[in-house]
Design a protein with these regions (language model features):
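Acidic, surface-exposed loops and disordered segments
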Residues: 1-216
Length: 216
């Protein structure tokens, strides 16, 4: 009797590791945003270190215009509240993560009340710090822009000068085989990026720095 051979699922970490054109730190090469998370809890100490990393991000005039709301599965009601701030498509997979966070940005400088044009940029820097710290601890972070800002404002009493801008699912990567087919395919697809020649210019818009000899 012949036994059917089941297809094997490639290890996401192997598939997802970047193939950079030039050397980069391994934390950047190994970082990626999974859709699948295990139910393993994130320790309080690890979670604290992630937000400590965010704390030390650079920002314009040291304004630090970011605020985060965080919820873990240890507090089901809080977790459900934060989950409800995501669009339906993101709720479907993010609900498996052990930790969810909401990134809020303040659009005004605290002292002058003037618009802070760097605010969203700086929130991104804080979250990037968090992501790299998470990667160093064997954790993964999937950032989302698909959320419901008005829902978040109401549930968390976010003031008028601030806005829920992004959400983060944090945890340990799960085997992609346990995901719905469409998400499994995404978790198993190689990471792709435009070459630097397409976004690093010199002299004028569209003039590649690599072609001009500024970069290799």
């Amino acid at each position: 009797m012949t036994t059917a051979t089941l297809p094997t699922v490639a290890a996401p970490t192997d598939v997802k590791k970047a193939s950079p054109a030039h050397p980069i730190h391994k934390l950047l090469a190994e970082r990626w945003s999974p859709y699948g998370f295990t139910d393993q809890a994130v320790s309080d100490s690890d979670l604290s270190s992630l937000f400590e990393a965010a704390r030390w991000a650079p920002s314009s005039y040291n304004e630090q215009p970011w605020t985060y709301f965080v919820a873990t599965r240890k507090t089901p009601a809080e977790f459900a509240r934060l989950l409800s701030c995501l669009v339906e498509g993101n709720q479907a997979w993010a609900k498996t993560a052990p930790v969810l966070a909401l990134g809020v940005v303040s659009h005004k400088f605290a002292q002058s009340g003037k618009d802070n044009r760097a605010a969203v940029h700086d929130l991104g820097l804080a979250s990037a710090n968090l992501v790299v710290e998470a990667t160093s601890r064997g954790l993964a972070v999937h950032q989302m822009i698909g959320l419901l800002p008005d829902q978040a404002r109401e549930l968390y009493r976010i003031p008028a000068h601030a806005e829920a801008w992004t959400a983060l699912a944090i945890g340990y990567k799960a085997d992609a085989a346990g995901l719905p087919e469409a998400l499994c395919e995404r978790d198993l697809s190689p990471r792709r990026r435009k070459p630097a020649s397409e976004f690093v210019f010199t002299g004028s818009w569209g003039q590649s720095a690599a072609a001009a000899g500024v970069l290799r």
